[in-house]
Amino acid sequence: MTKMTSIIGILMGVLTTATAASIPTGSSAAAAAALGSLGVSPPSGNVLIGNAGYTCSLLNRVLSKNETFTVTSPYYDVLIDEAWSENCRLNASCIVTPESAEEVSRLLQILSILETRFAIRSGGHNTNPGFSSIGSDGVLIALEKLDSISLSADRGTVTVGPGNKWESVYKYLQPYNLTALGGREAVVGVGGYILGETGGLSTFYNTHGLAIDSVTRFQVVLPNGTIVDATPTEHADLYKGLKGGLNNFGIVTEYDLTTNTGVDIYYEIKTYTTANTPAVLAAYATYLLDADINSNVEIQINPSYTLVFYGYLGHVSAPTDFDPFSDIPVASTMYPPTNGSLTELLLSIGSTGLTSEGVSYSGTFSFKVTGSTFLQDTYSTYLEAAASLPTGAVLSYVPQGVIPNLVTQGKSQNGGNLLGLDATPQVWANIFVQFPATLSQSEVAGSVDSLLANLISSAKSEDLFLPYIFVNDAGAKQKPLQSFGEKNIKYIDTVAKRYDPKRIMQRLQNQAYFVLEEL
């Protein structure tokens, strides 16, 4: 899941213990026979089950040398360090970098036969340790070589591999004057952004809806090795399940995305002082209650200042949608009012990325926007929490405003999604902290958890709380699948049973939001 992957964020420069213990170790003649059916000859002696070291030695023999990396490989540390957050740089027993869906198929079958734990990584921007990383007891499947991009003959869809970063997709589409719904930070990976994070917010998400709703085809490798296409008409149940069900079904190796014409946009970026931030939030609430679907305002609050991005689709001058903010004194202008290309904007500020040094931790909750002062009131609660953190820990608050059009877009495209969203003006609030690894992770994380609990309690007391948990920003302890509603989570479980009857993705995959744990 991508944390703070917004325009303004860029500028800022589980398996339970019991489940893990259930994975067997020992030897198995049946496993040897199953490997033989794949044309894989295990070393002489017993076949070890649930032993990552043994599995890695076998993979090193079966796959080409440039696809399997152990701790002694020169490229191993480089691959580990691609994880964005320092606390996610876990030392896997080995790292495998498949180059095709067929290789992913072979790999998944071997891991399933040998009952070996694994994690899947696209761009590595997840801040929850173990969600796209794994320690010495498992194999890391790094999808970076699945980086193909191709445009359909009618230019209506672009086929993208999960190993791409959005920067590559934007650059590929730019000569055609096209774009796709993708990360607001260009260095975020495609796979985690779309699938592992249930949706993905693009720069104009309120106009077009979530990125997951723009997917017209998923190529999926099921745990038994079968490669299938999931579309509205082919494996339609799996297609619908993937639009909310995360990585509970298999490994997605291709996405077909609807393209959009690369129209000009109006944008400007300003900063405001802490004294004026309550006024900014009051204006934001007013804006969200009557927002033009072609406009977008993004806010990132930091302890010493607040950043605001103003955007509008089309070549315009000073859109009136931003009038609620016009009388608030501006501390500085980072980008003056500009008419230009969305792609150029994303590439120009996204190439810098966010710092990857230090540890990251986050959480999220949702609430309705009404005529109340709740949004402004959250600011004082946030400031108190930020001031209580130890030196070096920087707490950010990102209230991501969502208008009803995002919800209706999701329901109208290709059969809808499984997120269970309410069509009401709302905020998906992200609380995000970065801090040096020398600080106590439990202390800092505990402060964030306490802040979230206080904000949720306040929202409930004012009857503004919404159950939806935006997976992109969710913490490891949160249960987003439950927030989709009972009907939707049961549907996800039904589809998971159908396509993964042995529950490989939930028994062997390292930490994630598993449907079995949230039912």
From Swiss-Prot:
Coiled coil: none annotated. Residues 88-262 form the FAD-binding PCMH-type domain. Residues 1-20 form the signal peptide. GO terms for biological process: terpenoid biosynthetic process. The keyword Oxidoreductase applies. It holds the Pfam family FAD_binding_4. The modification Pros-8alpha-FAD histidine is found at H125. The keyword Membrane does not apply. It comes from the Eukaryota. GO terms for molecular function: FAD binding; oxidoreductase activity. InterPro entries: FAD-bd_PCMH, FAD-bd_PCMH-like_sf, FAD-bd_PCMH_sub2, FAD-linked_Oxidoreductase, Oxid_FAD_bind_N. PROSITE patterns: FAD_PCMH (PS51387). Pathway: Secondary metabolite biosynthesis; terpenoid biosynthesis. The macrophorins cluster contains a single gene insertion (encoding for the terpene cyclase macJ) compared with the yanuthone cluster that produces the linear compound yanuthone. FAD-dependent monooxygenase; part of the gene cluster that mediates the biosynthesis of macrophorins, isoprenoid epoxycyclohexenones containing cyclized drimane moieties. The first step of the pathway is the synthesis of 6-methylsalicylic acid (6-MSA) by the polyketide synthase macA. 6-MSA is then converted to m-cresol by the decarboxylase macB. The cytochrome P450 monooxygenase macC then catalyzes the oxidation of m-cresol to toluquinol. Belongs to the oxygen-dependent FAD-linked oxidoreductase family. PANTHER family: BINDING OXIDOREDUCTASE, PUTATIVE (AFU_ORTHOLOGUE AFUA_1G17690)-RELATED (PTHR42973), FAD-BINDING PCMH-TYPE DOMAIN-CONTAINING PROTEIN (PTHR42973:SF54). This is FAD-dependent monooxygenase macF. The gene is macF.
